Amino acid sequence: MPTISLFYGIAIQMFFEDHPPPHIHARYNEFKARYDISAGNLLSGELPRQAHRLVQEWIALNKQALMENWRRMEKGEQMEYIKGLE
């Protein structure tokens, strides 16, 4: 599972051959969560409140790049790293 971004201790990952809808996996310490790319909604799991807000903000800022990575992943191509929040 490639890490496509890392910011404030939050690792953002996409899994090859993952199922729709397009989504990302976020990991922060012992917490794990899955977020829909199109709306930034939490699909499963949980993160602390501040980490959750940061992930949603990052998704909103990078929606186009995330969808492009999802398309690459579906084709078995290498995904690109996406800059994290600063």
What function would you assign to each model-found segment?
Residues 1-86:
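Basic nucleic-acid-binding interfaces
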